């Protein structure tokens, strides 16, 4: 007969600290991603055309806003409502499923950005890569629409799988009297849903890794050319290579950390019932979107100019603010 794993609870102070940290990560992520969205939306309001990179960043930041909200809900659910004797409640499974979908959409958009950087920066010498790079540059908006359509299809499939497995789990619970066996069925169903939802991440992961690898190889070739020609260090092509690679490597690192934290949280939740370990994993997952948004802002000239304009406006408002002096009394 199966035996239940001992439940590892956390103290009230740990829950309060976790909620405070989650709220701080949520605030930073919302501010950073909302700033990217507002800057680009303001350009649209002023009827200034957005380039392909701005459109992709706008879509990515909107996805990140949704992602940050889900992670905050996940933290509140875990700290306040989650009973570790029943770790796979329907609400918790729904939040994690939506997080997997939003994370997959952000990966698709990052793959599109990686392909765009590759087509704009890398100087190809063969015919086929030249045609592919030209097609990506000319048809980027159509490619983005196809990616969003594929994301919608993956979302529908993941939600269909989630609701079907939830229905089968409820049905098995009604027909079985063994609580332990019912928990095992719920764990298996959620594990299969996790695998099914992440299968759609394979194509964008491959596209992201291939285009990023091409950029790294191109950077190495460009640096060797610069050394042989003794070029100056202010080469714009070199700077474009470095900015693109910083964006891609940072996204890849944050994505791997987030995915590994989500992967580790599953056995912590289902097998060991360790709420403290799951809290650490969720804190790491919530830090990734906000951290990458900060890197995006620091590496984008348009967003940096917007921050400088805002700071200048605040400083000028402080200087212009009149000082009210009390008039002297007359006898």
From Swiss-Prot:
A GO MF term: G protein-coupled receptor activity
CDD domains the UniProt entry points to: 7tm_TAS2R38
One GO term of the biological process aspect: detection of chemical stimulus involved in sensory perception of bitter taste
Protein name (Swiss-Prot/TrEMBL): Taste receptor type 2 member 38
Function, in words: Putative taste receptor which may play a role in the perception of bitterness.
Pfam families given in the database record: TAS2R (PF05296)
Entry-listed glycosylation sites: 177
Tissue-by-tissue expression: Low levels in tongue, stomach and duodenum.
Misc note: Several bitter taste receptors are expressed in a single taste receptor cell.
Keywords carried by this UniProt record: G-protein coupled receptor, Glycoprotein, Membrane, Receptor, Sensory transduction, Taste, Transducer, Transmembrane, Transmembrane helix
Listed InterPro entries: TAS2R, TAS2R38
Listed GO CC annotations: membrane; plasma membrane
Subcellular location: Membrane
Main location: membrane
Segments crossing the lipid bilayer: 18-38, 56-76, 95-115, 143-163, 190-210, 244-264, 277-297
Domain of life of the source: Eukaryota
Residue numbers on the Cytoplasmic membrane side: 39-55, 116-142, 211-243, 298-331
Recorded topology in the membrane: Multi-pass membrane protein
Extracellular side: 1-17, 77-94, 164-189, 265-276
Organism: Mus musculus (Mouse)
Family that this chain belongs to: Belongs to the G-protein coupled receptor T2R family.
